[in-house]
Amino acid sequence: FSGATEATMRVVDRVSGLIGDAPPSLMRPMGQESKPGMTEWQHPVNHFLHANILLNLNIPSEWNGSFTTGPHGARRYKAPTSINVGNTGMTVEVGAATIVNEGPHGSDTHTVDAGGCAITAMPTWPQLHPLSVPDGILAEANQRDGDGFPTWLSSQ
């Protein structure tokens, strides 16, 4: 898993250049009003700095050195258990017979299967929460640059 450490540290290196000495909403001094102002509202980086967006990394054990920012895909497991009855008793085996990945090309499931590090910008708060991030901002936050990193992270 040494590749996972390297990939994580490369993302941390990019992020640490943004944060500065003190994030703008450290300890949420104004409660639910601790969010980007109206002039900052439309920019994913401001939601990240206010801790309303987080970066989720999924990295395979054998990382190929690439990064891809994109949405989450879905992973389903078919026949996740099997029960075997034998002469000496019953055994239960846990382990999917088939793993099915769904989602668009560039989603985390497909990226990890291809050996890449998947970066997904996710909301910290659920929908309908006063600090939730609009869907359009999340969609923009998951756009990638030529190196596979979030465009908002690279444009700072």
Regions found by a protein language model. Give the residues of each.
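Electrostatically charged, flexible surface regions
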Residues: 2-156
